[in-house]
């Protein structure tokens, strides 16, 4: 039985010509203690529905999936409420890619380029303290004129900065739900020609099969050897093992 350390979740849409509603595949991907990434679930459902995600997570739990250390995904999903019910001990990391787009959508185009740089300054900071300072600076700069943008950012503050408590070698992978996004960009391209002749079940089955093929070519997670330490509860601060910091200080 594999031990799943990190999981990524997303709702992936693929339009079907025969139906008005778009198929949403609720996707969960995980990385095990050996650094191998796998699809854990590709299920039909409603992205914003807690019930849909609850069913997905309960199915995974019934199959014996352990409590993951960290879950990564977009904030605008029913996934998070379901996760708190089914795997309440799992830490949460909001996807910086989705959050950046959502914040910028609350701003006029004239300030978006500068605001994007300010957002990047947060997650690119080497320490959580520096990230907090950049976070505060963004809020102070844009709150007076654009309160919707700053509220969008501020409401997920803790969950946006969770990655600092995990190995720095993993940051690139755990800051966003890009592992799912990039894979499904390819799958979406492959299923495009078949949309007119597939049912919802047929499309879902095809996505699942293409997903299985895709994962055969995935590389192991960068810095996978740190996963064992994450599992055993080794503490990390600003991406560095706490004992290492203490030894250097001594």
Model regions and ranges:
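RNase H-like nuclease fold core
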Residues: 1-73, 77, 81-82, 86-89, ...
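Conserved beta-strand -> loop -> alpha-helix junction used to position metal-binding or nucleic-acid-contacting
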Residues: 70-77, 82-118
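Hydrophobic/aromatic-lined pockets within catalytic cores
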Residues: 61, 65, 84-88, 108, ...
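Conserved, well-ordered core segments of regulatory domains
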Residues: 1-19, 74, 93-96, 102, ...
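Acidic/histidine-rich catalytic cores and adjacent linkers
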Residues: 121-250
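Active-site-proximal flexible loops/turns
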Residues: 17, 81, 105, 185-188
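A detector of single, family-specific signature residues
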Residues: 33, 43-44, 50-53, 57, ...
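Conserved phosphate-chemistry cores used by DNA topoisomerases
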Residues: 2-5, 24-26, 38-41, 51-58, ...
């Amino acid at each position: 039985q594999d031990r799943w350390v990190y999981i990524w979740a997303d709702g992936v849409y693929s339009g079907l010509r025969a139906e008005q509603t778009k198929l949403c595949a609720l996707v969960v991907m995980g990385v095990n203690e050996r650094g191998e990434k796998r699809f854990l679930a590709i299920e039909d459902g409603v992205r914003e529905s807690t019930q849909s995600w609850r069913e997905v997570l309960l199915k995974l739990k019934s199959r014996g999936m352990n409590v993951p250390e960290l879950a990564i995904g977009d904030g605008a999903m029913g996934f998070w409420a379901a996760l708190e019910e089914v795997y309440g001990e799992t830490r949460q990391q909001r996807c910086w890619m989705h959050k950046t787009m959502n914040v910028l959508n609350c701003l006029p185009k004239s300030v978006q380029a500068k605001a994007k740089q300010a957002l990047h300054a947060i997650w690119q900071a080497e320490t959580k303290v520096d990230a907090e300072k950049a976070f505060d600076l963004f809020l102070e700069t844009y709150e007076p004129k654009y309160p919707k943008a700053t509220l969008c950012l501020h409401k997920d503050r803790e969950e946006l900065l969770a990655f600092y408590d995990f190995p720095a070698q993993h940051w690139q992978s755990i800051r966003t739900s890009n592992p799912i996004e990039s894979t499904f960009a390819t799958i979406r391209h492959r299923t495009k020609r078949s949309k007119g002749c597939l049912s919802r079940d047929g499309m879902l089955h095809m996505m699942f099969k293409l997903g299985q093929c895709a994962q055969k070519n995935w590389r192991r997670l960068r810095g996978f050897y740190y996963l064992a330490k994450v599992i055993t509860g080794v503490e990390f601060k600003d991406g560095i093992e706490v004992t290492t910091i203490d030894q250097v200080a001594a």
